[in-house]
Amino acid sequence: MDLRIGGKYRISRKIGGGSFGEIYLGTNISTNEEVAIKLEPAKAIHPQLLFESKLYKIFQGGIGIPAVKWFGFDGDYNIMVMDLLGPSLEDLFNYCGRKFSLKTVLMLGDQMLRRIEFIHSNNFIHRDIKPDNFLMGIGKRGHVVNLIDFGLAKRYRDPKTHQHIPYREHKNLTGTARYASLNTHQGIEQSRRDDLESLGYVLMYFNRGSLPWQGLKAYTKRDKYEKICDKKAQTKIDTLCQGFPSEFATFLNYTRFLKFEDKPDFLYLRKLLREMFVREGYRYDYMFDWVIVRKLREKPPLERPLSNDNKQIQQQIQQQQQAQQQLQQQAQQQQQQTTTTTTTSSSQPSNVKNISTVSNIATTTTDEQFRQLLSTPSYNNVDSDQSPQQTTTTTSSSNPNQTTFYRQNKVVVPQSSSTTTKPPAK
């Protein structure tokens, strides 16, 4: 049967679903472009699709925000056609053995902060920040982190007067308990600070592999939420972040000290992450862990680990990153030597070129530009999303209620161009 939506899109197979409805892979009949088609029963008790489609239109044009191509009604369904995206960060986290390297955490955190700042600048809070709601792009935008699922989002201030919503208590928990802020657990109305506290927990989840309040047993959902809240309150931030750079504890402490109506200092938070990045000597080359793992798994049998043991894969990732750092240190030493040589040989004829200096420019320009970004102003709607990348698709989210927009397939992760070293613009 040839099912068509809006006279323009053809529905093919189901790629996801949950309590909200179902998601199908679709195709633009005219261009053959693949899209995601989300269907919600028109008689849903708590319909969200119309509201969500309006938010996507408000956020339209933002970096890392999928575009809505069509919204309408057909028979018993509300229907939204959107950009097709790649795997979620939760999918990729599982693919990499449920632990990310510090470099990957910092590159992701930088983009995730900018996505949250963008929706806050448009007067909304997300209220469900978690790995499942961040999806990588596909094709040439495979290195771009996308924020999705605005069904629980809420306007926190008037768009004209910027009057903040009032402080309230005794609210039900909205979002995902694992990543919810302490104030959310305690029934306090959410505001901008809560999105950022949730992001802090997500980053530590990526660092640690799990959070201390996971796996708690309870007979009812209410009891489980209470146990998670108690464990979260009892776990000191320094304990949660032990063994990792102190900036992660600083990040979480900052979010917890924010007041209800406070505007978060995103520049300060990004600077925390970026200073770590520079201190570790990383290059912003979009070489995420899943790119390295994919390359390792594609090696001939004699070159790759004897099994898919996650520890072996993590060791391989660390070895490759150490090798990259050593190469960078050598380049910096050569640059220093070149500077000395240039100073002592300034009396050379003008037609004599210092070949060493010329050859080192390409290896140092990117890092210098990246350091300059530490002092750049707060968010503007510009991103370095032109890095050529090749990506395909992956399995559906581990959360059955998660809105995901990608093909249900075997795990095939995005590739990245190893020659791309351009840092993200602010």
Swiss-Prot record:
This is Casein kinase I. Disulfide bonds: none annotated. InterPro entries: CK1_Ser-Thr_kinase, Kinase-like_dom_sf, Prot_kinase_dom, Protein_kinase_ATP_BS, Ser/Thr_kinase_AS. It comes from the Eukaryota. The keyword Nucleus applies. It catalyses: L-seryl-[protein] + ATP = O-phospho-L-seryl-[protein] + ADP + H(+); L-threonyl-[protein] + ATP = O-phospho-L-threonyl-[protein] + ADP + H(+). The lineage of its organism: Eukaryota, Amoebozoa, Evosea, Eumycetozoa, Dictyostelia. It holds the Pfam family Pkinase.
